[in-house]
Amino acid sequence: QLNATFYSGTCPNASAIVRSTIQQAFQSDTRIGASLIRLHFHDCFVDGCDASILLDDSGSIQSEKNAGPNANSARGFNVVDNIKTALENTCPGVVSCSDILALASEASVSLTGGPSWTVLLGRRDSLTANLAGANSAIPSPFEGLSNITSKFSAVGLNTNDLVALSGAHTFGRARCGVFNNRLFNFSGTNGPDPTLNSTLLSSLQQLCPQNGSASTITNLDLSTPDAFDNNYFANLQSNNGLLQSDQELFSTLGSATIAVVTSFASNQTLFFQAFAQSMINMGNISPLTGSNGEIRLDCKKVDGS
């Protein structure tokens, strides 16, 4: 059972150390908060929140970093390593890499204007990775709402969690390659996605021409790209969602998600409360506790390897 005081006797400053390291990282990288919370998300959806996403290729381990949802896009690993080093210097062998991801997510959100919440702790780190699981379990920006809802449901998260957690796209960037399917030939129609605002469409077509680079990046939230707020939901209401998986939350006819988007768009406090609770819910997915797993000394590799 995870709890808020897990390190109070062994590493009381753990949370403060994580926070100050991330504060430092923000100085040179305004998108680091979004990158760190995404690592936690992509970790938790694959065999639970066990830091399996952080393991590099080695021996029998096929790294999840090479999975489609992570290759060329998962980032922030260096900051996780910096946090781990700082923690090892203060309380060696105590704080798990999976707990670092949970703490880093809360710090990333609260440092950018979003809510704070009490992070439950006590996760341990996996001894292996699951490349196939990362390829199949992580929701894709190209998927329809029903598929994405099923993937959330498979890890015990409901429609409210889905909409709240999607709100993390209030900050961070996305590459042309994850939304250019909407720009020219959407689902074989030879035209753009009809749910994409025409002004945004023209600017994205210029940014991401048909034979252009798939790795050019743009803001997920065109109004306040680096602030954690509820503007993401207002963007959906004006068809300014960047990803297909974003816009479908509001544009899928008859979907239960529409009312949730509407309520979050009109009430930031409500969104912040829901987001904090859904982050706790996501952080509770199948953690390794007790004597399961280990406390990795280096987040990139299993101890003794």
Swiss-Prot record:
What name has this protein been given in UniProt? Peroxidase A2
Annotated site residues (Transition state stabilizer) in this chain: 38
Residues involved in Ca(2+) 2 binding: 170, 221, 224, 229
EC number(s): the record gives 1.11.1.7
Catalytic reactions on record = 2 a phenolic donor + H2O2 = 2 a phenolic radical donor + 2 H2O
What's the encoding gene here?
HRPA2
Paired cysteines (S-S): 11-91, 44-49, 97-299, 176-208
**Residues carrying Pyrrolidone carboxylic acid:** 1
Where Ca(2+) 1 binds, per the record, is at 43, 46, 48, 50, 52
Q: Which domain of life is it from?
A: Eukaryota
Presence of keyword Calcium: yes
Q: Name one GO molecular function term.
A: metal ion binding
Keywords, alphabetical: Calcium, Disulfide bond, Glycoprotein, Heme, Hydrogen peroxide, Iron, Metal-binding, Oxidoreductase, Peroxidase, Pyrrolidone carboxylic acid
Q: Does the keyword Disulfide bond apply?
A: yes
Per UniProt, where does substrate bind? 139
Q: Where does heme b bind?
A: 169
| Requisite cofactors | Ca(2+); heme b
Among Pfam families, the record links this protein to: peroxidase (PF00141)
- Cofactor detail note: Binds 2 calcium ions per subunit.
Function recorded in the entry: Removal of H(2)O(2), oxidation of toxic reductants, biosynthesis and degradation of lignin, suberization, auxin catabolism, response to environmental stresses such as wounding, pathogen attack and oxidative stress. These functions might be dependent on each isozyme/isoform in each plant tissue.
Q: What does the record give as the active site? A: 42 (proton acceptor)
Q: Which parts of the chain span the membrane according to its record? A: none
**Which residues, renumbered to this chain, are glycosylated?**
3, 13, 147, 185, 197, 211, 267
What GO biological process terms does the UniProt entry carry, in alphabetical order? hydrogen peroxide catabolic process; response to oxidative stress
Assigned protein family:
Belongs to the peroxidase family. Classical plant (class III) peroxidase subfamily.
